[in-house]
């Protein structure tokens, strides 16, 4: 059995998305600063059902004019494990709140991890 423990939740406001980190994980933010790029992993909790996890082919971007593709070849939220990934810039950190660019996650979306972006590790050489 696998166990995921959210480290915080997403909060949307007019200008930014705010990552609200739970108090027990705030110490893990040490070393992050304004201007850093981070990778944020979230759990698409509103798309999480047994039926939706079985969907393995989708029309990209939900457009039926696009031919069906396997979910691993798309950015669809319908997946066997509904994990979302965003690479974003930190605009501000205040206590347990990280202010980032807007992302398409709902309020209260569980944050499952944050990683510092590393060009060496995260950008393949083509």
UniProtKB/Swiss-Prot annotation:
The keyword Iron-sulfur does not apply. Residues 4-126 form the TsaA-like domain. Gene3D superfamilies: YaeB-like. S-adenosyl-L-methionine binds at residues 45-46, 75, 106-109. Pfam families: TrmO_N (PF01980). Keywords: S-adenosyl-L-methionine. InterPro entries: TrmO-like_N (IPR023370), UPF0066_cons_site (IPR023368), YaeB-like (IPR040372), YaeB-like_sf (IPR036413), YaeB_N_sf (IPR036414). The keyword Nucleotide-binding does not apply. Belongs to the tRNA methyltransferase O family. PANTHER family: TRNA (ADENINE(37)-N6)-METHYLTRANSFERASE (PTHR12818:SF0). This is Probable S-adenosyl-L-methionine-binding protein MJ1583. It comes from Methanocaldococcus jannaschii (strain ATCC 43067 / DSM 2661 / JAL-1 / JCM 10045 / NBRC 100440).
């Amino acid at each position: 059995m696998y166990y995921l423990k959210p480290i915080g939740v997403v909060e949307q406001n007019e200008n930014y998305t705010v990552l609200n980190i739970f108090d027990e994980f705030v110490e893990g933010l040490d070393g992050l600063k304004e201007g850093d790029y981070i990778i944020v992993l979230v759990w698409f909790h509103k798309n999480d059902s047994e039926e939706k996890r079985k969907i393995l082919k989708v029309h990209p971007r939900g457009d039926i004019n696009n031919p069906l593709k396997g979910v691993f070849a798309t950015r669809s939220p319908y997946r066997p494990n509904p994990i979302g990934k965003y690479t974003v810039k930190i605009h501000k950190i205040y206590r347990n709140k990280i202010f980032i660019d807007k992302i398409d996650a709902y309020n209260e979306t569980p944050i499952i991890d944050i990683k510092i972006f590393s060009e060496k590790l995260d950008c393949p050489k083509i």
